[in-house]
Amino acid sequence: MKHSYRADEPLWLNYTEAISKTWDIDPTYNAIHGAMKDMGEAKTHRVLAGMALYYHLGFSCQLAEQSTDENFWDVLGNNYEGTKRGTERRYFRGEQGRASLKYIKDNYKTPTDFLLGLHRDKYSDLLKAFGPVPAFGPYFVWKMGDIYDRILGMPIQADNCIEHLPSEPFKGMELVRKEMIARGDASFADYTPQQMFEYMESQTNKLGLIAPPAGDRLLDIREIETAMCGLKHFYTGTDYVGKDLVKHSESLLGYGETADLLRSHMPPVIARDYFMAPASVIKLHGPNRKIDEEGSNPIVKTTGLGSFFR
């Protein structure tokens, strides 16, 4: 089964629908949420604390497996230098990272204390709670909000989110604006960021797209943020629908039984051609790309990045 491009929908909405229906939008949430019952609360919290600091799912599982609540911070510190970091935590090194570990260890005895002690009901209050914690700027507080709301079932009201979004989704948002203007709606030129995100949320809601992993609500600004981060790379040919499913599934290989358990709950990998848009549509975006048109199946080539639309 493939997701067919629908010309009556803008490309950004086709893309968002495709990553939503395949759970490619946030597959790690499905994996952790699905394994929680078997892991138990304490180990789940160790996995999540590891993710908060290193953002590498495989290592976080290994760490949770080889530590206890009592020695977790020490084990984390002892493996500080050589531990893999996820791309999002590539700068969590040197004195900045050590200062963060020290602060957390000094203030929270266990990973459970850390997670539950910093939770707040509103995103604006969550930002304040994490304010004193080194290496937890707006981007990772946003990630923590996802951990609470989507994985732990501890809802967070998304108040004032637009004011604190990381910079990356705004780049995707501007591509949506350009696309909608190109489709003939000049009014998008005057939309504020708030109006843009409200528009995108309303369009995904009309399609009934649900938020992973529990599917307990429709997509909102938090999932739209994720989609916008991916959309920029999709338009420039460095991403494809299903890429995160592959990446995060592979990140669990070779990290022990807990990682294998999470991998068993990862959404299934899909074919690279699950969603393909006509070259004539893609040509509207990413002016630096070379497009080889072959019917409705374009091969988009970006220097040094390979071909992702095929």
Swiss-Prot record:
Gene Ontology MF, one: transferase activity
Organism superkingdom: Viruses
Gene Ontology terms: biological process: symbiont-mediated evasion of host restriction-modification system; symbiont-mediated suppression of host innate immune response
Matching InterPro entries: ADDT (IPR040741)
Catalysed reactions, semicolon-separated: 5-phosphomethyl-dUMP in DNA + putrescine = 5-N(alpha)-putrescinyl-dTMP in DNA + phosphate
UniProt keyword Transferase present: yes
Record keywords: Host-virus interaction, Inhibition of host innate immune response by virus, Restriction-modification system evasion by virus, Transferase, Viral immunoevasion
Other remarks on this protein: Mutant am37 contains a normal amount of thymine, no alpha-putrescinylthymine, and hydroxymethyluracil. Mutants am36 and am42 contain more thymine and less a-putrescinylthymine than wild-type.
Family indicated by similarity: Belongs to the thymidine aminotransferase family.
Function of the protein: Transfers putrescine to 5-phosphomethyl-2'-deoxyuridine (5-PmdU) to produce 5-Nalpha-putrescinylthymidine (Nalpha-PutT) as a step in the pathway leading to thymidine hypermodifications in the viral genome. As a final result of the pathway of hypermodification, Nalpha-PutT substitutes for about 50% of thymidines in the viral DNA. These modifications probably prevent degradation of viral genome by the host restriction-modification antiviral defense system.
Protein name as it appears in the record: Putrescinyltransferase
Organism field: Delftia phage PhiW-14
